[in-house]
Amino acid sequence: MTVRIGVVGTGAIGRDHARRINKVLGGAKIVALSDVNRASAEAVKNDIAPDAVLFATGEELIASPDVEAVLVTSWGATHEQYVLAAIAAGKPCFCEKPLATTAEGARRIVDAEVAHGKRLVQVGFMRRYDAGYVALKQAVDNRIGAPIMVHAAHRNPSVPEQYVTPMAIHDTMIHEIDVLRWLLDDDYVSARVLFPRSAARSHAKLKDPQIVILETAKGTIIDVEIFVNCHYGYDIQCQVVGEDGIASLPEPMSVQTRLGARLQNDILTDWKDRFIASYDVELQDFIHAAAKGTASGPNSWDGYVAAISSDACVAAQETQGAAVAIDLPARPALYQ
């Protein structure tokens, strides 16, 4: 069976996902495209999906009987409306993060999916599909005993001037917020944010670096360093301290050289290079589930919890180190 997929939003990530589906993965084909910039959709049609039909709006694409599943890769503020339309149409939907730009919007999606009675939404938290994180989770679940502490870091070489302090949470740490919750199988109960002295490469509207301290319901303490102007490379670190041992996220594969009296490994500089393979795996997972009329992987509840947790972290940026509670409602049975 070939799943007929429509793409709403043909910017950089939408174009890349369309390429993946038509050129790399199996079991699916791009049959429809829509973007507010018609020229963008036309370019994807010409370069990647020549048989695709162009639609004036995302809603028209979703309603088309020729479309069996939907990719929402449009501007973040539009995600909610398109995901809700896909649920109303009963069509599996892959939505890039964020699920919605507010926790209230994410909750509306959860409520709509629960009312529908079947999982239809997969959220694009691709780190769960990274081979290193999968191996780390196996170690956490089976080898090192109950987790006590987690030390994590998310470092970028640089960010543009328009990147401001809250974006360190909503745009950057959002990945840690999801993947660490999945890694520990535990929910957060509070967040604190500490600010060291700002790095010289920061700017007036960005406090960088920052340290976020999360506490979980089971009592695990997590510290996450966010340093988006580290200069030296793109570097993701994660170490879980358990009762019986320690497990660390593997480093990306790199050629080690012994040259000029130095032992060296290269460090990546681009997030796309670090996690490119996980995008293939997550979309293949979506295709397999969509062929059965459902969805798997990170779900709407995960997107909702990430929104609540990130909002709490942003609030904690203003409390001079005081903890902010993360209050989660009961999880619906659909997501148990």
Swiss-Prot record:
Keyword NAD recorded: yes
Enzyme Commission code(s) on record: 1.1.1.18
Molecular functions (GO terms): inositol 2-dehydrogenase (NAD+) activity; nucleotide binding
Protein's UniProt keywords contain RNA-binding: no
Keywords: NAD, Oxidoreductase
InterPro entries, alphabetized: Gfo-Idh-MocA_inositol_DH, Gfo/Idh/MocA-like_OxRdtase_C, Gfo/Idh/MocA-like_OxRdtase_N, MI/DCI_dehydrogenase, NAD(P)-bd_dom_sf
Gene3D superfamilies tied to this protein: Dihydrodipicolinate Reductase, domain 2, NAD(P)-binding Rossmann-like Domain
S-S pairs: none
Reactions this protein catalyses: myo-inositol + NAD(+) = scyllo-inosose + NADH + H(+)
GO biological process: inositol catabolic process
Subunit architecture: Homotetramer.
Matching HAMAP family: IolG
Free-text function comment from the UniProt entry: Involved in the oxidation of myo-inositol (MI) to 2-keto-myo-inositol (2KMI or 2-inosose).
Family according to the record: Belongs to the Gfo/Idh/MocA family.
UniProt protein name: Inositol 2-dehydrogenase
Organism encoding this protein: Agrobacterium fabrum (strain C58 / ATCC 33970) (Agrobacterium tumefaciens (strain C58))
